[in-house]
């Protein structure tokens, strides 16, 4: 009932009186199955303003009791120049609200991946935040966030939904959420090749990543920060046709069999090597893939 109160508060913008809050704080939550917790948490996430329910959950002790990975965000400082809104918890609530506005037209499993990615994206900050050279830094927090994000998903028993691997996408979003902004900054310096986009698409849905990165950028003081990087990132991904998945391999085992290659480790190595060339863009069609394979075979036999 306490969890239901949170999602009702979020869905209907309700407030709770003090006696009700006091009563909720006395109710034990340690015997709830993961499926029940997820059922209420999912409804909370799809409220118009999920932050209302999350903030109430913190006030009632629910976040501390059920989600220690989220509770660790409370009071975790951020560099004021980049995060004038406050600590990581405050920022996360704003990002979740922004993410909720970016779900239109997507199937439910992808919507869940976006919302959970927004919740989990900065879970690596508590373990990495330090004061360095006069600045609050959270170096490598995106990669370090994968482990606490995994624990968080375990608490909800959240894996695949309707055949879609939500868990993999949430972890991918967490690990890669800085890429759109970083690559945008690098594009006029060392540049970011098409191969980088194709390879990143092996790790995460680039469309979902861009949407969460946009929510992350806007989940601060409104109107202060330039968030056009995410539009650029989405346009590049769409132009390459890798917004949802990496390119399908052009060269297949049957093509190598026709060249006289027997099934086995050598075939696997050839397929992998030619696919890497495809990702780089040096192989663009079957003729090119076959030529690359013949060259590799000849080199190995020389």
Roles of regions detected by a PLM:
Residues 1-115, 119, 123-140, 144-162, ...:
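Glycine- and charge-enriched loop/helix tracts that form the active or gating conduit
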Residues 17, 33, 166, 193, ...:
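Alpha-helix initiation/capping motif
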Residues 76-84, 158-227, 242:
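Histidine/acidic-rich helix-loop-helix segments that form or flank divalent-metal centers
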Residues 93-100, 191-197, 250-257:
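Short amphipathic alpha-helical segments and their helix-coil junctions
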Residues 107-108, 202-203, 239:
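Short hydrophobic/aromatic segments of transmembrane alpha-helices and their interfaces
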Residues 111-115, 120, 169-171, 205-212, ...:
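Active-site lining segments that contact anionic ligands and/or coordinate catalytic metals
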Residues 184-190, 217-302:
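Terminal helices and disordered tails flanking the catalytic cores of nucleotide-processing hydrolases
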